[in-house]
Amino acid sequence: MCNRNVITIPYEEDMSKYSILHQVGGRIEYFQKEYSQYPMFAFDSEEDYNEYKCLIMQLKKNKKVSSFSF
């Protein structure tokens, strides 16, 4: 079995976050817990995860700015 250092965060049903996930090279993985499988966002490197966080912050910032537009 190969031991990978995968960074995982909770799955969110948000199409913009899902799009950014794939943009940075992330993916959805399923983890087994007892008798159920749970989806998680997974990244192979800390750089991919940091890029994801940065793009999510930009997305949130842009949404706040656009909500104040008249």
UniProtKB/Swiss-Prot annotation:
This is SPbeta prophage-derived uncharacterized protein YotJ. The lineage of its organism: Bacteria, Bacillati, Bacillota, Bacilli, Bacillales. The gene is yotJ.
